[in-house]
């Protein structure tokens, strides 16, 4: 399952604190990217962004995010991809049934 994890730094959080925490955890994994981390995006302006994390275990997702929770808050949602053309076809059918 793919999870959209929006993060926003707490007002007291500094760039240096975030950098230190990320590097600490990176070194603890012997310099390896977490296998479950599929994407990492920051929002323009800083202090917020989102992660795409893949895991079938919600407890593992919580464990992945918890080391950062003193620095930032998370809003987490399960997501899935859509095929655009297939969605258009299905929406046409729905619209035709409504007529």
What is each PLM-predicted segment?
Residues 1-99:
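Conserved, structured core segments of small domains
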């Amino acid at each position: 399952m793919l999870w959209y994890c929006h993060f926003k730094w707490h007002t007291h959080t500094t760039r240096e604190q975030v950098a230190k925490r990320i590097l600490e955890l990176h070194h603890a994994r012997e310099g390896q990217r977490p296998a479950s981390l599929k994407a990492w995006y920051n929002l323009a302006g800083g202090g917020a962004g989102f992660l795409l994390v893949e895991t079938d275990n919600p407890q593992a997702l919580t464990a992945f995010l918890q080391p950062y929770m003193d620095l930032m808050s998370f809003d987490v949602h399960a997501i899935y991809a859509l095929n655009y053309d297939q969605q258009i076809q299905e929406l046409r059918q729905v619209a035709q049934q409504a007529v």
